[in-house]
Amino acid sequence: MSSDPMRNIRNFSIIAHVDHGKSTLADRIIQLCGGLEAREMEAQVLDSNPIERERGITIKAQSVSLLYKAQDGQNYHLNLIDTPGHVDFSYEVSRSLAACEGALLVVDASQGVEAQSVANCYTAVEQGLEVVPILNKIDLPTADTERAKAEIEAVIGIDASEAVAVSAKTGLYVEQVLEAIVQRIPAPQPRDTEKLQALIIDSWFDNYLGVVSLVRVMQGEITPGNKLLVMSTGRSHQVDAVGVFTPKRKTLAKLTAGEVGWVTASIKDVHGAPVGDTLTLTSDPAPKPLPGFQEVQPRVFAGLFPVDAEDYPDLREALEKLRLNDAALRFEPENSEAMGFGFRCGFLGMLHMEIVQERLEREYDLNLITTAPTVIYEVLKTDGTLVAMDNPAKMPPINQINEIREPIIRSNILTPPDYVGAVITLCEEKRGSQIGITYLGNQVQVAYELPMAEVVLDFFDKLKSVTRGYASLDYHFLRFQEGPFVRVDTLINGDRVDALSVIVHRHQAERRGRELCEKMKDLIPRQMFDVAIQAAIGSQIISRSTVKAMRKNVLAKCYGGDISRKKKLLEKQKEGKKRMKQIGRVEIPQEAFLAVLQIDNK
């Protein structure tokens, strides 16, 4: 090693759109550097979570430290952080990039640039990173490297003349990627202070070790036995062990400046080491914390309730442990008349919500009911106060509301020219307003302002179906905008079910109410009495359907006989049904709560 220990360190992330081959390229890099032996190698070795492997997507950013002997004869220490590509997990990307000096932008040579590659690349450029374009999948017969290079220059605006063309699947030319990393990505720079500063990139909970933190040491060094100060909480913890992932966990004697590794300090409190925080020495603290990364705001809210009320404390504990590993998750206790005690949770999007529910059910063995997701609205009350509302059931009475504002997003859609008409039609159906259309080589960029409520539910699926899977979407929050919104309540036998309330645009209210009643009629099982399902805005009923009662034939045993005998039996049955209806409760199945989702948002 040279006299400057940081000179031969390279910290880099891999950024790309979903399915462009990030994780496969990471596998090849690990293989070439000898991080794992051949028998330990498996596809997508960094996607360690079973849900990631099943869905074929990366959810959590993973890190790995490798040694590489370059063609110039020197040994280089490479720290690779694999990042997710889905729009819901873009915050994971920005966290990973904060710990790097460079990024590999992987583009599928057969598909060209897609929206998420653009968004992630802009994030990298904003943070001042060196971006190295990589063209992947050149082994495919449909690969067109020249077109992909032209698109990178036209759509993203970075020079692609020196882009490295590889096939991550076969390993062709991957060595050139390693050389490009060594030559083009800068080494870590010393900070303006001599004192220890380490940025927490990620944390997770281990039942034996407590909180394990993944850190990037910016300045100074961490050795076991040091007392570390967590700068935001002001608490000190003694370091038990430090090390790196190779991708296996490997213990080291110390972590020095420029390195990315893990630290354990017997922190048993789940909130002990928040992500984005700075670690420094208790005895000699740094003057100020490192700039962290933006707090991410959840956009989609839903209620999570345990099927069995006794699981409530377990659900709280599971959510706290998951929150440590997933900084974007928010939750607060909620009480629902229909569902009992549970939590109101905030997510980044529908995929994030599905993944969280799946992780809770699998990793913590919980049985959960989820209510229909909703976005956050702003309500301006008549007394001038502005309240944020993430739960339709908590909306103030109509006479106290001055205006309701919904969140508007700006979406960038990249699509082949053949499907522009279909994309515009879809956006207009979703109450969108067009900002502009730009033709870029073989792709068209369509920019729209759209209501977030229309986008989070099923917009992505519909966009894929109208463009046969070719379009890609990226969006970010813009502002809140006033509109004519109402709350549609669902009444079952005259009782309002708070978990089924939805906020909709006034023009869509009657249709949504009618469709909801029809859907619920199919899902609620028949009872011994008629069940009335009504949709209402305030006290005005806008639609109704009835689940007919099951009826026992009480006249079966009266063969002939007097008509008054039959009348008496029928009257008796009628009385019983009336009494049953007064005290009878209707069990609402889980499917009924999700029926709100399935109503087509035309």
UniProtKB/Swiss-Prot annotation:
This is Elongation factor 4. The keyword Metal-binding does not apply. It comes from Xylella fastidiosa (strain M12). It is found in: Cell inner membrane. It is a peripheral membrane protein. GTP binds at D19, H20, G21, K22, S23, T24, N136, K137, I138, D139. It holds the Pfam family GTP_EFTU. Its EC number is 3.6.5.n1. One of its GO terms (cellular component) is plasma membrane. It catalyses: GTP + H2O = GDP + phosphate + H(+).
